[in-house]
């Protein structure tokens, strides 16, 4: 009887402990399962990390090989031979240094980076075109510039002197933009570098090369540049006395009436608004000729005679052909990238990596 009671008690204890034992076993099994899963996850992450490292290594090697290829290719590019108009000396400048110095000289460093890139590609393209023309004509230099007067190209030292306390900021911004695109040029449908003309501000629409220089260029045709109307200096008025006008026109042999109000008559304008024919006394000139004779900012002008002086009101600044620099900055601020900007102004051109 005592044995039976003892067994019954033992069974009761076992029954009471059984759920606890099961729970502990279940917890242990769960812990083991979690440990196995964690170990598997660690191994997966390690394998993934190895794959990533391998991929990054291969990509880096590929980039290094590509960079070496580019360096070798660009190292074969001839430096530009630049005639310094101030000193009369010819200096050789590497392509990359020229592009950086040209952008620094020709476009405000405060402009958007995409506009600076567009200027860099334009400068490289123009210089390459000039270099090839110079080789054909057996010239001693490719083109001229006047670094001392900040025209066409400047050295880093000249930029440092000009920019002063802003040198690090401005030179750094220009250099970064040039570094990204200095190997690129704009080409025509035959893959040849275009005549990458540019100017400061258009009259609101660019002019064709044919109307300005008499030679048609497939990529230098009128393009919309309405953003230029927001540029500082878009509209300017220059007053000139009759005596000064007469002196400026003397080399043309023009005979002028006694009444100054009868001296000028605009005869014709291009579709972009630039004067293509103007009567000056008994001589007919084009707008570009009168602009150069009188030192006007643009050949899109109006003429009036008020209070004893001539008033020449101009729209834009420059010849108006090709890339408008202020227009490029305007488009950049609207979200356009440098390729879109260049292909907008150089109609039909394509931006690509330069070949040998």
Per-region residue spans from a language model:
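Conserved, single-site charged/polar hotspot
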Residues: 1-356
């Amino acid at each position: 009887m005592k044995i039976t009671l003892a067994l019954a008690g033992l069974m009761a204890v076992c029954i009471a402990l059984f759920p606890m034992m099961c729970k502990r076993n279940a917890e242990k099994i769960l812990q083991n399962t979690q440990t196995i899963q964690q170990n598997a996850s660690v191994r997966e992450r390690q394998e993934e990390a190895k794959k990533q490292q391998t991929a990054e290594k291969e990509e880096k090697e590929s980039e290094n090989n590509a960079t070496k290829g580019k360096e070798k290719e660009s190292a074969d590019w001839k430096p530009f031979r630049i005639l310094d108009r101030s000193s009369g000396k010819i200096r050789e400048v590497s392509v990359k240094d020229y592009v950086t110095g040209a952008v620094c000289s020709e476009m405000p460093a405060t402009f958007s980076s995409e506009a600076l890139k567009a200027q860099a590609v334009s400068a490289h393209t123009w210089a390459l075109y000039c270099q090839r023309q110079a080789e054909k004509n057996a010239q001693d230099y490719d083109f001229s510039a006047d670094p001392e007067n900040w025209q066409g190209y400047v050295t880093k030292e000249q930029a440092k002197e000009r920019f002063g306390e802003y040198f690090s900021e401005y030179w750094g911004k220009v250099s970064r933009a040039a570094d990204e695109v200095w190997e690129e040029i704009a080409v025509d449908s035959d893959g040849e570098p275009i005549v990458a003309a540019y100017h400061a501000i258009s009259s609101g629409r660019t002019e064709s090369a044919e109307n300005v220089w008499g030679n048609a260029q497939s990529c230098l045709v009128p393009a919309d540049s309405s953003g230029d109307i927001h540029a500082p200096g878009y509209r300017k008025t220059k007053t000139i006395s009759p005596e000064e006008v007469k002196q400026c026109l003397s080399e043309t042999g023009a005979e002028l009436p006694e009444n100054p109000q009868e001296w000028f008559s605009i005869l014709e304008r291009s579709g972009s608004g630039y004067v293509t024919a103007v009567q000056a006394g008994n001589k007919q000139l084009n707008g570009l000729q009168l602009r150069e004779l009188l030192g006007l900012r643009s050949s899109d002008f109006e003429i009036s005679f008020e209070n004893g002086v001539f008033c020449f009101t101009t729209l834009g600044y420059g010849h108006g052909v090709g890339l408008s620099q202020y227009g490029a900055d305007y488009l950049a601020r609207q979200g356009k990238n440098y390729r879109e900007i260049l292909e907008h102004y150089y109609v039909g051109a394509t931006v690509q990596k330069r070949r040998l």
